[in-house]
Design a protein with these regions (language model features):
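Extended, intrinsically disordered, low-complexity segments
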Residues: 36, 97-121
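Glycine/Thr-rich beta-alpha phosphate-binding loop at enzyme active sites
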Residues: 1-52
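Glycine-rich beta-to-alpha transition loops that act as phosphate-gripper elements at the mouths
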Residues: 36, 52-64
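Glycine-rich phosphate-binding active-site loops on the catalytic face of alpha/beta enzymes
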Residues: 2-12, 59-60, 65-94
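Thr-Gly-centered strand-to-loop micro-motif
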Residues: 30-33, 56-57, 79-80
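General structural feature for long, well-ordered alpha-helical segments within catalytic domains
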Residues: 38-42, 65, 91-99, 109
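Generic secondary-structure signature for well-ordered alpha-helical cores
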Residues: 1, 48-51, 75, 97-108
Length: 121
């Protein structure tokens, strides 16, 4: 068992000249870096409330983003929108190597990092 949180948020944009929705189907979704603070908060709340793993999703494009999700309590992370970056699938290696270097520098394990933000509340 586990839970994945979050993904795209409901969004809409309106042309101020015509008053018409810009997107063809009227509604769309907001994803990527713009939703990361919302995603981190959701992961923090869910990890605190649940006894099952939480996978953090939303705005992860750098190792620092993954670290932040893990600090909020995520057992793992998912990358989506960032795959469109020029780095492509190389982002996985970049995130893993950056996180590994960070943990070595901090002399911490991934488990010690997980949920650390909750220890300050």
């Amino acid at each position: 068992d586990g839970v994945v949180a979050i993904n795209t948020l409901k969004a809409m944009a309106i042309d101020v000249e015509s008053g018409r929705p810009i997107l063809g189907n009227r509604f769309g979704g907001l994803s990527g870096p713009a939703i990361k603070p919302v995603a981190v908060r959701c992961v923090f709340d869910l990890a605190d409330a649940l006894e099952i793993p939480v996978i953090g999703v939303g705005g992860i494009s750098r190792w620092q983003d993954a670290a932040e999700m893990i600090m909020a309590g995520a057992a793992g992370v998912q990358v989506g929108t960032a795959l469109r970056n020029p780095e492509g699938y190389g982002i996985f290696r970049s995130i893993a190597e950056g996180l590994s270097t960070y943990l070595e520098r901090k002399e911490m394990t991934l488990e010690e990092l997980r949920g650390i933000a909750g220890r300050f509340s």
